[in-house]
Amino acid sequence: MIFVTHQLPVNVPGQPSLSRQQVWDGLVLKANNALPFVPSMSYCEVTQRHSDTIFDRDIDFRGERFTERITLEQPHRVTFTRIAGPVLGTIANEIEGAADDLRLRFSFALVVAGVEGGSAQEQEYADSMTGDYLKAVAATLNAMRRIAEQKNAVSA
């Protein structure tokens, strides 16, 4: 099993600042349509809504098809549970910290079908996935900043 967690500060000098609500709104947008947020994803469609906070979506990530069940835990966590596809497990996006020190944590625990746990092949996959997820974290924060700037420009 692959376990990875990474945390980045939400607000950095020289970039537009985001509030906890703006980060939450961005995570909800990402859960519903990840394409503007995740460079390695080429397809994302919500396929079934179980409630206001739980829904399923199909995605193509790195050329492979997955079905994920999304759980929104307002105002701090979105959980993506892979329920079908060649890599199963859980991915969590969590907002942490005080208002003046917001952080976004991405964690995943994944099992690659047909790959022995602890093997060199699993480690190679883990390293590749970690790189993709670090890019996704940065792209997610950048997309949230763009959205916030657009909303600020409209309301100004």
Predicted regions: what they are:
Residues 8, 43-46, 67-71, 89-97:
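Hydrophobic/aromatic beta-strand elements that line small-molecule binding cavities or substrate pockets
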Residues 43-44, 141-156:
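Short, highly charged C-terminal tails/helix-capping segments
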Residues 10-12, 30, 61-63, 110-114:
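Beta-strand elements of well-folded, non-transmembrane domains
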Residues 4-6, 55-57, 68, 91, ...:
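Hydrophobic residues positioned within well-ordered beta-strands of beta-sheet architectures
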Residues 16-18, 35, 131, 138, ...:
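Short, Lys/Arg-rich flexible segments
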Residues 1-45:
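Hydrophobic ligand-binding cavity/cleft-lining segments
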Residues 83-135:
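Beta-strand/loop substructures that line and gate deep hydrophobic ligand-binding cavities in soluble
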Residues 46-84:
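Glycine-rich portal/gate segments that line the openings of hydrophobic small-molecule binding cavities
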